[in-house]
Each structure stands twice: as structure tokens, then as C-alpha cells.
UniProtKB/Swiss-Prot annotation:
HAMAP family the UniProt entry points to: UPF0398
Organism: Pediococcus pentosaceus (strain ATCC 25745 / CCUG 21536 / LMG 10740 / 183-1w)
Pfam family, one: YpsA
NCBIfam families, per the entry: PRK13660.1
InterPro entries in UniProt: YspA
Name of the protein: UPF0398 protein PEPE_0933
SUPFAM superfamilies, per the entry: MCP/YpsA-like (SSF102405)
Length: 183
């Protein structure tokens, strides 16, 4: 059993505000390609948080992949119990759909948001309950995911933990493949 933590840019950090944005198709193709590679090399669990963007896209893709890879399971982990309560209704509904399709759901903290320590506890939980991580992230273009990457790098100092990134160069390559396929 191998468990993969997937995280990365939030949708707004990539200026993606619609499911019809052409950038999203390229990102989804890159994520799907990497998820398939991971599943075919032994990953049995895809585990992500509820953030808009990479985390939700990854769970949607992983849930689709379960048709071809029935051994694959998905988990959605909330850092605290009232995550997303301030979101617009359509975003809350989309998260509820994802939550309904995953194989496992839990809150790392059963309390509503109280302080940033809950987010660090979430990172520690993810690191201690996964074997490796996949990040949609580019060090040259910082975003909130830098906090997860820093936690991973710190964890790696004392633990064997692999991290792979899909960066903007990878997305550029994926974009060229996508354009070739479209022609």
C-alpha cells in the first residue's frame, strides 16, 4: 500500500476562475498523467485536502481513475471541522460532491478554525499518513503551497519521504502536447 498526498496551487493563484478556463484542461492533463503513473507504480491511496484548485482537481481526477483502477482509493482530509464555511454556495456544493465520492473523509481537527497551529497539525498529519507527495508547484512562482513544501523538506531531514513537483515547465510541455492533440 502506498499513499500519495496531492496538493498545490489554489485556483485563484493560477487565475483560474471557471471550469471552462483552457489552462485548467492542461493542468488536469498533467495531473492525470502523473496520477496514472503513480497508480501504475503502486500507489493505492490518493489523499488531498479540500482547497479550491489542485487538491479538488486531483480528487476529481482520482475518482474518475477508479473506473480503470478499481484498487485505487481516495481520501479527503479537512484541516478543521468548518473548512469552507465562508465560501460561496456553488463552491460548497462542489466540495460536497467530491466528499460524497471519496472512499474516506475525516477532519484532522474536530474543532472549527481557531489558529494557524491547526494548519501545521494538518501538514504533520498528512506527512505521517502518506508515503510521498505530488505538488503542482514551481519554486520560481511562490504560492501558499510553499508552506507545505517547507514542511515536507523539514520532514525529509529525518524521514524517507519522496516529493515530486509539476512545475510551470512541465505545464508548458503539457500545453504543447495538448495543442498537438487538438490539431
Amino acid at each position: 500500500m502506498s499513499r500519495l498526498w496531492v496538493t498545490g496551487y489554489r485556483s485563484y493563484e493560477l487565475s483560474i476562475f471557471s471550469d471552462q478556463d483552457p489552462k485548467l484542461k492542461v493542468i488536469q492533463n498533467a495531473l492525470k498523467r502523473k496520477l496514472i503513473e503513480k497508480v501504475e507504480s503502486g500507489t493505492t491511496w490518493i489523499i488531498a485536502g479540500p482547497q479550491l484548485g489542485t487538491e479538488q482537481w486531483s480528487l476529481e481526477l482520482a475518482n474518475e481513475l477508479k473506473m480503470d483502477y478499481p484498487e485505487l482509493q481516495t481520501a479527503l482530509m479537512f484541516p478543521f471541522s468548518d473548512f469552507g464555511k465562508q465560501w460561496k454556495e456553488e463552491k460548497v456544493e462542489k466540495l460536497a460532491l467530491i466528499k460524497a465520492k471519496v472512499d474516506f473523509f475525516a477532519n484532522v481537527s474536530e474543532n472549527p478554525y481557531q489558529n494557524p497551529q491547526q494548519l501545521r497539525n494538518y501538514q504533520n498529519f498528512m506527512l505521517n499518513h502518506t508515503d510521498e507527495a505530488l505538488l503542482l508547484y514551481d519554486d520560481e512562482h511562490e504560492g501558499k503551497t510553499k508552506f507545505d513544501l517547507n514542511a515536507i523538506r523539514s520532514f525529509q531531514e529525518h524521514n524517507s519521504y519522496n516529493v515530486e513537483t509539476i512545475d510551470f515547465y512541465d505545464l508548458e510541455e503539457e500545453s504543447m502536447l495538448y495543442e498537438e492533440k487538438d490539431e
